[in-house]
Amino acid sequence: MKLHQHLPLLALLTPTLALAGMNDDPVLAKLDVKQLEGAYRDSDTRLVWNLEGWLGTDLHKLVLTSEGSRLDGRSEAQELRLFYRRAIAPYWDLELGWHHEPLAEKRDDRALLGISGTAPWFIETELNLLAGPGSDLTAELNLEREIRLTRQWVLTPEAGLTAHNFTDRNEHQGSGLTDLDLELRLAWEVRPDFAPYIGVAWERKLGDSADLTRASGHDVEETYWRLGVSFWF
């Protein structure tokens, strides 16, 4: 059969193929509760959460994150972020948006520029730059690696490093490297979307921040035992 005899059939198939192509990247939504836990240190028990919700496609997403803690029924720390996430390379995204700390002494609203993705050796990497009033800048680096011990048991080491280019004595924060956070979690994946876990976290103030914290009578390092659950839907 010659090519011109196929043309009517191709004409009929073209709209169907175009519609299928439009649905290759559908709009989806997800809520990921990465951490919902009790953090235990001496006689203190904190409720800690870290969650992310998004709406969009593989290429474009609108993302809202919330992270914070409560002690004795009162919120002691909280961060909200709303940003646009765009895929820029396989396994890598660019993020641009807004960072807000509602519990800060002064209203804390900053612009957010970040990049996140999977580095070699399957290390989940997040690098964020927060720009505040004037020339105030904060840089955050977070690294995480999931190590699957068995089909259900997963060990996750995590590290975080924070730096500032300004001093805030009210928050016992100096300029330069300020915080180092290390954490280790062991999770049991009951289902792919539900996993209870136990863990330990170590937090350390660095540089001038350590000096300001020590001068205020507070500890420069803290260790927490953690018991919690992660889930998504």
Language-model features: where?
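Detector for outer-membrane/organellar transmembrane beta-barrel domains
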Residues: R107-R169
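Transmembrane beta-barrel strands of outer-membrane/channel proteins
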Residues: Q35-G38, L64-G68, L96-H100, L127-A131, ...
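Repeated loop/turn-to-beta-strand initiation elements of outer-membrane beta-barrel proteins
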Residues: L59-L64, P90-L94, W121-T125, T150-L155, ...
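Outer-membrane beta-barrel "beta-signal"
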Residues: L184-E189, D219-F233
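Residue-level signature of outer-membrane beta-barrel architecture
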Residues: L55-T57, R86, G117, L129-A131, ...
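Outer-membrane beta-barrel initiation region
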Residues: K2, A18-G73, R86, E222-W225
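Residues that define the transmembrane beta-barrel architecture of outer-membrane proteins
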Residues: V27, T45-W49, E76-Q78, R107-A111, ...
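Membrane-embedded beta-strands of outer-membrane beta-barrel proteins
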Residues: L51, L82, L113, L141-L143, ...
